Amino acid sequence: MTDVKIKTISGRVYFVKTAEPFEKYVERMTSFNGYIYASTIIKKPTYIKTDTIESITLIEEHGK
C-alpha cells in the first residue's frame, strides 16, 4: 500500500491510499485528464480534478 499526499493549486491538501508503487501512481496521474478519488484531512471522501494538482508527495510505501 502507498500513502500519498496531494496538494492542489488552491492550497488544499488531500490524501490517497493506492496499491500501486508511487512512481507508477504519479506517472498515471500526470498523464490522466479527469477526476481522482481522494480524502480530505478529516477523511471525508471527495474528487479532485487532475489539472488542479500542484504536487504529489509520497508519505509512506508499504510492502516493498
What is each residue range found by the language model?
Residues 1-31, 37:
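N-terminal acidic leader/helix
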Residues 35-64:
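Short, mixed-charge low-complexity intrinsically disordered segments
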